Every structure is written in C-alpha cells, then in structure tokens.
Swiss-Prot record:
Protein name: Malonyl-[acyl-carrier protein] O-methyltransferase
Domain of life: Bacteria
Keyword S-adenosyl-L-methionine tagged: yes
Residues spanning the membrane: none
PANTHER family in UniProt: ARGININE-HYDROXYLASE NDUFAF5, MITOCHONDRIAL
Assigned protein family: Belongs to the methyltransferase superfamily.
Function: Converts the free carboxyl group of a malonyl-thioester to its methyl ester by transfer of a methyl group from S-adenosyl-L-methionine (SAM). It allows to synthesize pimeloyl-ACP via the fatty acid synthetic pathway.
Keyword Ribosomal protein assigned: no
Record organism: Halorhodospira halophila (strain DSM 244 / SL1) (Ectothiorhodospira halophila (strain DSM 244 / SL1))
EC class: transferase
InterPro entries: BioC (IPR011814), Malonyl-ACP_OMT (IPR050602), Methyltransf_11 (IPR013216), SAM-dependent_MTases_sf (IPR029063)
UniProt-listed Enzyme Commission number(s): 2.1.1.197
Length: 295
C-alpha cells in the first residue's frame, strides 16, 4: 500500500463522533477491550520500568486502568481528542490513584521531548490525519530508552462492508487503513529503533448487516474522510447495501461477519531491542462474547 492510498482524516469529525459516542461506547467496545488486553499482555516481556506512562487515545480509560495496575509507581497520563471520553476516564479512575487526563491532538502533544518511558496506544493511530507527523510526535515524547507499544487497524478491516458499498457504486463510505509495511516504513522515518510489527485477524458476527453499521456508529467509528458522502442515507440504498452484504457473506447459520485486521507495533525511542510477540492466527468472535484461540 502506498502512503497516498489511505484516506485522509477530518479531525473535527473524529472528535465530534467520539464525543457523541462516549456514553454508549463501553456497551459495544467488545473488540477494543480484547485488543487492549492483548496489547497489555505484550508488555510483560518488555523490560521497562517507567516513571511516566502515556496512554494515547485513551477513550473511556479501559487500558488506562490496566496500565495503572501494571505500573503502580508510574505517573500515567490519559490523552484523548474527545473531552467526553476523558470525562468517562475521570469517572471510572481509582479514587486513590487517578491518571492525569489531557485533551490533546496526537499530532501536537503538549509535552516536552523525552517525557515518557512508555508510550501505549490502543486503536487510535488509524485516526491520525497525518500518520508520519503523528509517529514523529510519538518518537519525540518517548525517552531514549523508552518503549512504544500500539495497535491499529490494517487494510482488511471491514472489507465485507466496503465490498457491499462498492456493489452499489459507493466505495467512499468505509475508511481505508494503512498496512503494516507502510506503518513500519513511517516508524523508521520517524526515528524509532528496530520497529517490529505483526498482526492478527478478528471476526465479529452479527444477525444483520445493519447491526454492523449500528455498532460502528455507537463506537464513534464513522468515516472521517473529508471527501466522504454527506447527507442522509435513503432506506432504499441501505436495503441494497444490506442485500449485497448478505449475498456475499451470509454464513450457514444466517449470521454475517465483520473482519478486523489488527496490526501490533512496538519499538524503542533511541535504543534497545523490543521483544517479538508470538505469532497468532485468526480468531472468530460473536459480538456478544470473545472466544480466544487456544495456542
């Protein structure tokens, strides 16, 4: 994938969408919690003892609370673009040990150079308007011996929905995501040392295609491309999209899949050797619960 193949992002649209979804976000963020848990597990072999930790794109604070438990002596900062998300972080934080909540754009973080020994980001980088700039900011605030650990979405994410829209002549309704090779190249250009990227595929299953779109809206994961189609979607056009989705992807049990390709990345600020995670396969999931593949 070339850098220009990924869609551009309207940051104001991203902020509005996540602000609007904050109250319902935790009800539907099944995949986001699972990926956060796996990303937190990947910290176990990484030899860092941070004084300060950055949770970038903290959302409602699920991973923030995991970081507080793991690094009990560290000062944890929860950063998000959406103020309503940070209100949820504050509301759910431990009374005796609250994170520092900062509303900020990941393209211009309000911190000095080398501020954090650990930068953690769960499913936020895909919303960067300019990925190279965002990665340079992450590198800038990472201490020389600090580690960066993140997860983002890859290009196979929601390919079923994208294909259904293409069948009715509209490919711009579903966001396109950068692949791991492009992300790795951008990390090297940003100055990270020895970036390692791998990934795995998750499949959520739904009773109807409309439920896929309903969950995306509840998550705030709307298409933020400035060139996206505007205006209300007609019932007739929505019915055509659903029919195309079912025709191509309906499973024997009548449910339809929604695939998410998750790319994991980790590196060091200026030195050290990150630990490589184990290889993983595909995991199939019901929207009401996650079943982990036995290894």
């Amino acid at each position: 994938m070339n850098p220009g193949d990924a869609q551009s992002i309207d940051r104001r649209c991203v902020r509005r969408s996540f602000d609007a979804s904050a109250e319902r976000y935790d009800e539907v963020a099944v995949l986001q919690r699972e990926v956060a848990d796996r990303l937190l597990e990947r910290l176990e072999p990484v030899r860092v003892h941070p004084r300060r930790v950055l949770d970038l794109g903290a959302g409602t604070g699920y991973a923030t609370r995991g970081l507080l438990r793991r690094y009990r002596k560290a000062e944890v900062h929860a950063v998000d673009l959406a103020p309503a998300m940070l209100q949820r972080v504050r509301r759910r934080a431990p009374w005796l040990r609250r994170p520092r909540c900062v509303c900020a754009d990941l393209h211009a973080l309000p911190y000095p150079d080398d501020s954090f020994e650990l930068v953690f980001s769960n499913l936020a980088l895909q919303w960067a308007e300019d990925l190279p700039t965002a990665l340079r900011e992450l590198q800038r605030v990472t201490a020389p011996e600090g580690a960066v650990m993140f997860a983002t979405f890859g290009p196979e994410t929601l390919h079923e929905l994208r294909g259904a829209w293409a069948e009715v002549g509209d490919q711009a309704r579903v966001h396109r995501f950068a692949d791991k090779h492009d992300v790795g190249d951008r990390m090297l250009e940003a100055g990270f040392v020895d970036p390692v990227l791998d990934g795995e595929s998750f499949t959520l299953t739904y009773a109807q295609p409309r439920e896929v779109m309903r969950d995306l809206k509840a998550l705030g994961a709307s298409n933020a491309d400035p060139g996206r189609p505007r205006g209300l979607l007609s019932p007739h056009r929505l019915a055509r999209v659903e029919a195309a989705y079912r025709l191509a992807w309906r499973q024997p049990d009548g449910r339809v899949p929604a695939t998410y390709e998750v790319v994991y990345g980790h590196a060091w600020g200026m030195g050290g050797t990150p630990q490589r995670a184990d290889d993983t396969g595909e995991v199939r999931l019901d929207v009401h619960g996650i079943r982990r593949r036995r290894r």
